[in-house]
Amino acid sequence: MSPQSALLLADIFDRWRLQLPDPIVNWLTPVWILCVGAAAGLLLTAVLWGVLRLLSAIPGIGTLADEPTTSRVAIVVLSIVFLGLSIGIYQGTRRAQAAAPAAGAAAQPAPQPANPQDRIWGWGGAAVGCFLLAVALVTLVSRRALAETRIAIREGVLWPLFVVGTVLACGSLFGLVLIRKPTELLESLVRGPALWMAGTTSVPIDLPAPPDQFADPAQQEIRVNFRKDEIRSLIVKSDQHVRVRTEPFDSQTDPSLVVTLDVPAGEEKTWLRDQAGANPFREAIVTKLYAKNLSTAKAHVDVTPILKVAYPEMSLVPILAVAMAGVFFIYLLLRAAFPKLSAVALATAKSDIAQPIYLILFVIGLFAIVLFVVIPYNTFGDDIKQLKDSGLSLILVLAVIQSVWAASTSVADEVEGKTALTVLSKPVSRRAFILGKFTGIAWSVGLMVAILGVWLLIWVAYKPIYDFREGGYEINHQQQNTDPTWHDCHREMVQIVPGLVLVYLEALVIAALSVAISTRLPTLANFIISFAIYVLGHLTPLLVQSQVVANQLPPIIFFGRLIATVLPVLDHFNIQASVAAGVNVPTVYLLWSLVYCALYSTVAMLLALTLFEDRDLA
């Protein structure tokens, strides 16, 4: 879409936009971005499913998963191809990053070389990921797996997730007449890949020497082409003394609104855009800058504009889209690769969702999150941090209660009620029974965390508006007399997304341990032990690191370290410090938390299989 078309559509939508108060629009804009992500997720899922459907129609590919030897060869070949593509993309990205600091070393430091150990871990993880992707592709391209898509959506947790996603996608359509200039926001989705592929380019120009050293240097135009809302910095490098301006030198514009770079010979100057200040460029598409050669020799000038998308907040859309598509295809993959395990998981998830306690926990979560918004915390401007912490803690507690209750009812009660004996009398192994129970609990808990998480995101986006009206919200830690912008609401909203991921990972660890306990103990004992593990998992690090306890009660330190070695340290999934400091959680931390969760869940499942293997079910 051309810039002129985008601006025209933006004006059309702006004319039809409902005239809502600015605070409401600022709240609804990040919510609309969330809805666009859901719509993109449904669209991406449909497109990928269509591609798999077309591939399955090719003779020999649709039946590839049914031929073990051929499928193994295909997996190896696809793994090599995916790894090669990953290496190519990585090398291209590294070259692009290396070129950017070369053009503007003053703007940003050069990237440090990667640690060899981190590089080994990174490429090892990439190889494993490529292998798993190849296995998934060979399995999902099966005609049998794709034929069961409709049944898979209508049963289990995919249907409520589909309903929620559809409601959010409809919200993206209604948002077109509620927010300001939505086409400009949507255009950032297209401009992001375009800017990444274009990279950072310099505009060279030679400025002739003045005919007379006493004469006023002539003004020269520098031809550029970028959008004013995408410029982040401007780097000018010259071998002679030059001066570059964003307006003609004879312009009567207020000097505070004009960028002037005086570049000495052999140096470079960098202008950094102040996001809170006025944009010095007046035209939507900047096509020219102005320069003068202040030396007595010919000057060679390199002008490098550093561009980024106008609305980086839209990066949430592809992340949500990939996450939604990933959940859908992981569900189909488990159903196709492990049919017996998936049958047990489906029955477990449907049974858990149908329980009255599941609905009760849902209602408690929905009402409590809204209540947290209006509760005065009296924190002198940090009420929103308390809302985030309270909301995440609430979702975690509800998820833990649901996981322990589900493990007790689906394993312990079925064993005591002889229902498990009936299931195992069919061609279902004990291993598939236990793993299926855990998978079903993981799906039901994931549904709860997802829906309550979206509800929390919506109200966290509203909290800055509410607190500002109550006089308790500070923008950028400085009191201002303007309402929080939608950028502020979006920033507060996305900061808790990693927290929701960690909440789910912690609930999975508790669920795995609860399943292992429920293979031998009844419901009450399972609740007591599981919540004791929950408390110790959060309390043990404090005891181990306490200097007062270390000096006065050394035995407690010993037992604390012993418990920390045997039991999972659940404090790794707690981001309360990050929320209090207002900083984002690094992606690497989430990946290591995922590895930690996978390791402890695997150990718990091995323990559950060992305890259940010789359990007398008669």
Task: List each model region and its residues.
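Cytosolic-side transmembrane helix boundary signature
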Residues: 55-63, 130-163, 335-337, 418, ...
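Secretory targeting signals
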Residues: 21-41, 48-55, 68-83, 94-131, ...
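Beta-strand-enriched, solvent-exposed domains that form extended recognition/catalytic surfaces
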Residues: 174-316
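Alpha-helical transmembrane segments of multi-pass membrane transporters/translocases
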Residues: 26-50, 118-143, 160-179, 312-329, ...
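Short, strongly hydrophobic alpha-helical membrane anchors
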Residues: 1-29
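Helix-loop-helix units of permease transmembrane domains in multi-pass membrane transporters
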Residues: 25, 53, 57-72, 154, ...
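Aromatic- and glycine-rich beta-strand/loop motifs that create alpha-glucan
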Residues: 338-359
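Transmembrane helix segments
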Residues: 85-91, 164-185, 363-364, 368-378, ...
